[in-house]
């Protein structure tokens, strides 16, 4: 088991203090990492309003051919969405009503996750009628599973728990894994996030007033509850999305946190799904929430933008 290293918060304080000395504002959506700012989540490269059928969209995954697969947390339907337009191109039924929270394609097998921890695999999913098998495993009862991702380096599926995974891990957030070859679930978490490490007293640090004001009601990360998860196909980094705190964490494969983004509320009403394409572009879906319509946002890696854009965004 890897306990996620949160010693980076000391470095984070230094980064914020430096920002306070050089700028009067620190826009939400930019990273406060220990290494770089690969994405700017206040500046989407594309934004799509999704069909009303997807008001409860909860899971997102690339399924090939520039298409996204999506599920919503009420009905057992698989939605195929054109990533370039946000339009639904196909809908296929795979099961009855249920709280479906995650979806992921691993090689040619599609996995769909329910909040009770049940995982269904579909070897032949690109057909009019989907027939799947339930993966036999036993997650902790209080896990409330909401994220599933394929870690290709280990040939395993990762499952994130929204709630505390039991007494021995009280107050922590866990990520379990099951081996694709055997279907066996790890008995202990492969990653363990201690949310107590995310408590951060703003008053103890000399941030400027703009930063202090923005962080005052959002820096307490004790409410961090993973709602979506994705593995970067190029780097193997793990991205954990949280609706409650409107934030996004990036971890390396050793479990070290390398970046934190606070997501601007005007773009992220209820972020639930996340997927990353082979180019490194991040797609995040929002349930309808107060806006009354769901959205799909695309963010390109900052390193892929022109140098002039990078300079402009940093000013």
Where on the chain are the PLM-derived regions?
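C-terminal motif of bacterial Sec signal peptides marking the signal peptidase cleavage site
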Residues: 18-20
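Bacterial N-terminal signal peptides that target proteins for export
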Residues: 1-9
